[in-house]
A protein has these predicted regions:
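Hydrophobic membrane-targeting signal helices
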Residues: 16-18
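Extracytosolic ligand-binding ectodomains
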Residues: 2-12, 21-393
Length: 393
C-alpha cells in the first residue's frame, strides 16, 4: 500500500504539466537551466484524456526509477529555493511514445541548457552525449555501469563506475587484504562472464598478482561441485564471476553449507548484490559475503534524515536510493553551475558540494591519448556477516 501511495503521488506530480516538464524557483529572469532526462514512461501510464491506464491499486514497478529520481530532484530544487538560487529544471521523458529523445532535444525551446542530468540506457546515452558534445553542454549520467562505447567526449561524466573499474577494484581489494590466500572464481558460461574474466586477468597480469583459478559451473551446480575446488587445510577466497544475482545467491547459500563442514571460505561479488537484503537470512550465515558498490549512503547525515522524514510524514514510505541520488546530483551540479557558470566544463572532476558519499571523478584517457570522459572511481566495500551488513572501506 505504501508503494502504491508513493507511485500515484509522484505520477500525479508529473502529469500536471505538459511536455517538456518545467520546474523552477521563484527567481530572477536570468537562471541556469538544467535538463533532467529520465525514463518517466508517462505515455504508458496515462491516456490522452489524462486517465490512468492501470486498474485500481495496481503497482507498476517499472515506472519507479525515473519517478523516484524526479522526486529527489524536486526536493533538491526546493532546498535550493530556500537559498533563492536561480535554477530551472527542464524535464524530458526519454521514453515518450510520440517523440524520441533526440527529437525532443532538437525541438527544445527557450535558452540553451547549461547542463544535462540523465538516467538512461546505453543507446540513449550515446544520443544525449553526442548532443552535449555538439552543444558544449556537460552531460552527467547517474546510473550506467558502462560508457556506452563513447570516446573523445570531455563533457561526459559517469557517476556510476564502469564494470571494468568495479572488477579492478575488487581484484585490488582481494590482493591487498588476502595476499597469500587461494582465489577461486566460480562462474557461469556467457559473453559477459568472459568479459569480466578478461578484466581480472588483464589487471592481475599487469600487477603480477598470483593467478586465479576459474571454474565454470553447470546451471544445477551442487555443494560437491564447489567442495572439489576447495582446500580443507587453508582458507579460500571465492569470487562470483558473474552479474547474475540468482547465481550469486545460490553460490552463497551452498558455500555457507560448505563452511559448516571442513572448509573455511569467504565470498566476494559485484554491485548487483547491493539491492539484495536476502543475505540477512539464515541460509547465508556462516560465511562473510563482501561486495563493492559505487553508491553507499548510511543515511545518518542531516539531509538524508530530512528526506526520510518527508517521505514518512507525506508519502508514508521510505525513500529509495534513487530518490537520494536524484537529490545529490541536482544539488551538486546546480551549485557548481552557480559558482562557475560558463566555466562549469573545467570543474567536472570537482569534489565540491558532495552530500551523501565521497566520489573520485577521474579523467579516462583512451587509446588515442585523448580524454574520453570522466568517471567516478570511488568504490565502497560492504560485508554481510552473520546477517548484518557493514561498511568495511
Amino acid at each position: 500500500m505504501k508503494g502504491f501511495r508513493i507511485f500515484w503521488m509522484l505520477l500525479f506530480t508529473c502529469i500536471l504539466f505538459s511536455q517538456p516538464l518545467i520546474a523552477q524557483n521563484n527567481v530572477p529572469k536570468k537562471s541556469v537551466r538544467i535538463g533532467l532526462l529520465l525514463p518517466l514512461l508517462l505515455d504508458s501510464a496515462i491516456d490522452q484524456k489524462n486517465n490512468f491506464k492501470f486498474p485500481p491499486k495496481t503497482f507498476p514497478k517499472y515506472l519507479l526509477p525515473g519517478l523516484e529520481f524526479y522526486e529527489g530532484a524536486l526536493l533538491a530544487l526546493d532546498s535550493l529555493n530556500k537559498k533563492r538560487a536561480p535554477i530551472q529544471l527542464v524535464v524530458l521523458d526519454t521514453r515518450a511514445a510520440k517523440e524520441n529523445i533526440q527529437t525532443q532535444l532538437e525541438k527544445l525551446a527557450g535558452p540553451p541548457l547549461d547542463l544535462i542530468l540523465t538516467h538512461c540506457n546505453a543507446t540513449e546515452l550515446r544520443i544525449i552525449a553526442t548532443y552535449g558534445l555538439k552543444k558544449n553542454i556537460p552531460v552527467i549520467n547517474v546510473n550506467l555501469p558502462n560508457d556506452a562505447g563513447i570516446t573523445g567526449n570531455p563533457f561526459l561524466v559517469l557517476l556510476n563506475s564502469t564494470l571494468r573499474t568495479q572488477c579492478v577494484a575488487l581484484a585490488d581489494h582481494i590482493q591487498s587484504k588476502y595476499t597469500k590466500q587461494q582465489v577461486v572464481v566460480f562462474r557461469k558460461k556467457g559473453g559477459l562472464e568472459d568479459r569480466i574474466r578478461s578484466y581480472w586477468e588483464e589487471n592481475n597480469q599487469a600487477k603480477k598478482i598470483i593467478k586465479w583459478t576459474y571454474v565454470d559451473l553447470p546451471d544445477s551446480f551442487s555443494v560437491n561441485h564447489l567442495s572439489a575446488k576447495l582446500d580443507t587445510t587453508k582458507s579460500t577466497i571465492c569470487v562470483a564471476g558473474t552479474l547474475d544475482e540468482n547465481f550469486g545467491k545460490r553460490l552463497a547459500a551452498q558455500l555457507a553449507t560448505v563452511s559448516k563442514q571442513r572448509y573455511k571460505v569467504s565470498l566476494f561479488g559485484l554491485p548487483t548484490w547491493d539491492d539484495s537484503k536476502d543475505f540477512s537470512r539464515l541460509e547465508y550465515r556462516g560465511i562473510d559475503i563482501t561486495y563493492c558498490t559505487p553508491y553507499y549512503n548510511s543515511r545518518t547525515d542531516s539531509v538524508s534524515q530530512q528526506v526520510q522524514q518527508f517521505f514518512a510524514t507525506t508519502l508514508y514510505a521510505r525513500p529509495s536510493d534513487m530518490v537520494l541520488r536524484g537529490y545529490e546530483a541536482v544539488w551538486k551540479y546546480a551549485n557548481l553551475l552557480l559558482k562557475y557558470g560558463n566555466n562549469i566544463a573545467t570543474q567536472l572532476d570537482s569534489n565540491e558540494f558532495e552530500l551523501f558519499r565521497e566520489m573520485e571523478l577521474k579523467p579516462v584517457i583512451g587509446k588515442e591519448k585523448q580524454l574520453d570522459y570522466f568517471e567516478n572511481k570511488k568504490l565502497f566495500f560492504l560485508k554481510w556477516q552473520d546477517g548484518i551488513r557493514k561498511l568495511i572501506s
